[in-house]
Amino acid sequence: MVKQENIRNFCIIAHIDHGKSTLADRILELTQVVSQREARQQYLDRMDLERERGITIKAQTVRIPYIAADGQEYELNLIDTPGHVDFNYEVSRSLAACEGALLVVDATQGVEAQTLANVYLALDHDHEVIPVLNKIDLPSAEVDRVKAEIEESIGLDCSQALPVSAKTGMGVDAVLEAIVHHLPAPKGDRAAPLKALIFDSWYDSYQGVVVLFRIMDGSVRKGDTVRLMSTGKEYEVLRLGVFSPEPTDVKELFAGEVGFLCGSIKELGDARVGDTITHADRPAETAVPGFKEVKAMVFCGLYPTESEDYENLKAALEKLQLNDAAFSYEPETSQALGFGFRCGFLGLLHMEIIQERLEREFEVGLIATAPSVVYKVVTMDGKTLEIDNPSHLPDPTKIDTLYEPYVSMDIHVPNEYVGNVMKLCEEKRGTQKNLHYLAANRVVVTYELPFAEIVYDFFDRLKSATRGYASMDYHPLDYRASDLVRLDIMLNSEPVDALAVIVHRDRAYTYGRGLALKLKRTIPRQLFQVAIQAAIGQKIIARETVSAFRKDVTAKCYGGDISRKRKLLEKQKEGKRRMKRMGNVELPQEAFLAALKVGDE
């Protein structure tokens, strides 16, 4: 057993593509935890999707035995955290499980938005942060400029910053020595009652829920009965172990150590990230602070393309929810799309990942409706409602005030694109709060924007306005009263609930015009005329018409009486009228995509 003062728990903070997973790979190889033969790129990113997108979605841990230059044996626990804003709560819990962090910055790129967001989280936890400059083997690396940027934006002393190249392995041994000498050992009393923080959990079909935890005080043995403090439920520890990096069973874990346990926990909701584990017979007095319920921020409807796939989609969503407590869903029906589900997500990346996993891992064809956020409605009789589906918005005459969520957004951008960014944010109803120069050619612009405005296409448009150079980070602020209306789309006077959206009154007309035009281009022509109308309440604000195919019914009449032709034309007209009354318009998937792309042109 390693002494407590020789344990180091650390995580690696970096923006996407700055080399976090590569550095982790090198550390594992250098300490011979993973042999060269078993090594694969991004060893800790287990999901194919994580590897492909180059992002970390779930936290992973690995125990690394390390003999330092002074001959002492240390136990290093690397906790690999997600880097994206959507998973901010998971990051904050992973950081709470460590005492220090390596801040990896790409020496060719400099400080980016998500690096900053996560560093501030680490500093909130009073972490010791070691700056590491990666990719110094590239000719475009500017070490001094990036050091100055880190000092300017974060206020970290970079005189001791470590230059490394995670790709070639250069300088990685110095990183290990720095972890041992600069990061503090975990505090915690091994004799006190057990108190352990859950920082990740997932579902295993053989063992039930597997819980990753860090012991703050006390110790836990296999066979103990433990209690989860937020729910009060009790479980027997059937399996206890550590990842090094494959799961290895151990008999006992002590304060300061990181490990996993299985205890026939059936549902992921019972072992929530951020909860505290304690002994049933000798409980801790207080829980680890900072636990909160994760709430979905973005909602959208998911429907199977083939109605017989409904059961498959339901089973797939159940499986995904086992591994993702932040994802929620409930059944809903739409007149246009049939049976489906209303799903809640942490943010846009989370939504994209879930949709991609459904299509890839479960092979379910999907139609996704336009994403929406949660609005608060105060009705005339004083009730407050939370609305996540535009078609559930009450009648405008019954609404007293409508509130929408706002976010604060930091955008890092080279100064030649600041004008484009400001123009985009103004267009999205943003208010500028701050503009701050990081270096001579890098600016941080802070805006407050309605969350609904960034849900659609903000990120894509930001990237195209700055040629891909901007990076952004946002966090929720509060709810503010806004002049919002529900825009309904009607086909032949029948409202299509799946296309309803909530928009600001000033933008309703242009949005309605744009959407009607897009739909005109995407809805295939029928044998009867299709009228596309955009309406606010009873008032029609835009209309487009998809003209009908026309069969030449008089082609076979040569000469002869005009009344014969007229009779055939009247018969055709009557048939079309009946068809229009009876017929329904099939909406292709492109029609729903069109709703997301209004305003692109």
From Swiss-Prot:
Keywords of this entry: Cell inner membrane, Cell membrane, GTP-binding, Hydrolase, Membrane, Nucleotide-binding, Protein biosynthesis
Membrane topology summary: Peripheral membrane protein
GO MF annotation terms: GTP binding; GTPase activity; ribosome binding; translation elongation factor activity
Pfam family, one: LepA_C
Localization, UniProt: Cell inner membrane
Coiled-coil residues: none
Residue sites binding GTP per the record: 17-22, 134-137
Gene3D superfamilies (UniProt xref): 3.30.70.240, Elongation factor 4, C-terminal domain (3.30.70.2570), Elongation Factor G (Translational Gtpase), domain 3 (3.30.70.870), P-loop containing nucleotide triphosphate hydrolases (3.40.50.300), Translation factors (2.40.30.10)
Gene Ontology CC annotation, any one: plasma membrane
Residue span, tr-type G domain: 5-187
Catalytic activity: GTP + H2O = GDP + phosphate + H(+)
GO BP term (any one): positive regulation of translation
Top-level EC class: hydrolase
SMART domains: EFG_C (SM00838)
Family: Belongs to the TRAFAC class translation factor GTPase superfamily. Classic translation factor GTPase family. LepA subfamily.
HAMAP family listed in its UniProt record: LepA
Function: Required for accurate and efficient protein synthesis under certain stress conditions. May act as a fidelity factor of the translation reaction, by catalyzing a one-codon backward translocation of tRNAs on improperly translocated ribosomes. Back-translocation proceeds from a post-translocation (POST) complex to a pre-translocation (PRE) complex, thus giving elongation factor G a second chance to translocate the tRNAs correctly. Binds to ribosomes in a GTP-dependent manner.
Protein name, per record: Elongation factor 4
Natural source organism: Desulfovibrio desulfuricans (strain ATCC 27774 / DSM 6949 / MB)
